[in-house]
Amino acid sequence: MALIEAVSASKIYRSGDVEVAALSDITLSIEAREFLAFVGPSGSGKSTLLNLVGCLDHPSSGTVTVMGTNVAALNRTASAAFRGEHLGFVFQEFNLVPVLSAYENVEYPLLMVRNWPADKRRTQVMKMLDAVGMAEQAHKRPDQLSGGQKQRVAVARALVSEPQLVLADEPTANLDHATAHKVIALMKQMRDEFGTTFVFSTHDQKIMEAAERIVMLEDGRIVKEQRA
């Protein structure tokens, strides 16, 4: 069974009498351990598809199944529990907790979904912060960090619990060239070591070059797929 399965999935947004089809009749299978990128122009449906795969939204019609679970069958509480247990996210807006330090932001998923002792948590948090070059900034709050530094903390937070699936919306958007390559290498290392599946929404050529499968969207439809 595929890790992710979309069958004739569509997403329609309504505003009064106006309907906008963000996604139309998407059928797609993603296997475990894939390193895959959704690409396409702004408004093509990349982020909407990522939201469906990440149990952040439900399709208007059709089905999206993640790890054997039909996402439309989950209520809000069950969706949150499923995401916390199995998924990691990197958002363009970072979504860091402003009153927590970088260390505490990265530790947060472990406190929520992993019953690890404090010493194991600390080792894992510092390992991830060091991997993204942020160990020396661990004590700083988000308002004391640059955009690129916040992005690195967000990446560390997404990876810290060693999730089965990581969904990343433009994860390298605020990173310099060298750091972006380092982050991509870290993600591939996690895929190789832990079998993590990575799905990206991106315009970044560096991620497109690293991806082993590219799914191209246009006007809410898949128009082309290619493998490395």
Regions found by a protein language model. Name each.
Residues 214-226:
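H-loop (His-switch) and adjacent beta-strand-loop-beta switch element
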Residues 2-217:
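ABC family nucleotide-binding domain
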